[in-house]
Amino acid sequence: MAAMQDLEEHVKEVAADVIAASIGTDPSAYLNMKNYRDRKKADPKFNLAYVLNTLQGKLKVKKDPILHYATAYGSVPPWILLKSVYFSTIITFISKFKPAEQAAVAERLYDYNSHNLTIDQCRMLMMDTLYICLDYRNTAAHGGRIYLLSPKSTLRKQEIFGNPHVGGTGYGQLLFLLGLLKYRRPYEQLRSILNKELTRHCNEYPNDSTYLAQALNIYIEYKK
């Protein structure tokens, strides 16, 4: 799912920039537990210590560009290290950021004033969006059907927007969430592919348009 991979790389870049600006570029600083917050989870994989240990392990990888930076400069900056981790790891890492750094990431991803959101609502929107996108990315990576997916992660609609019905559900909700981002390419990629496939299918099976619109929770307008 190219759009989700595109979003993943963008989020990694933004997170790395925020870390570098706020904490520093040396791993001894930006992988120091005191610079983050930890809320204990039942699953240890979602705890701060596990995430930091994972990132520390990546520093030992004997492959470029990590090896190059470690050898040439004696240090691996966050924008190099974070490129090597899974989307799930970077999302969990961002969830451990202190409020100021998490807000800085959210401000880079959203124009929250135009959405009439507070920065705290924007932080919630960011985390919910990332976890929902991860569900779609993982499903696609394992060959699952994403168009009819009901993600395990949920959007806190009432807390964020004051409306429990905003954004719809399913694939329509995914498009809604991607459409709120400043970085438009993932949304445009998904929308373009969907329009192309729907046009092809509905030209061949026009009676399917109503069913597909309901299943995907989107409005369908196709060219014959």
Question: Where do the language-model regions lie?
Answer:
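Amphipathic alpha-helical interface elements
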Residues: M1-K224
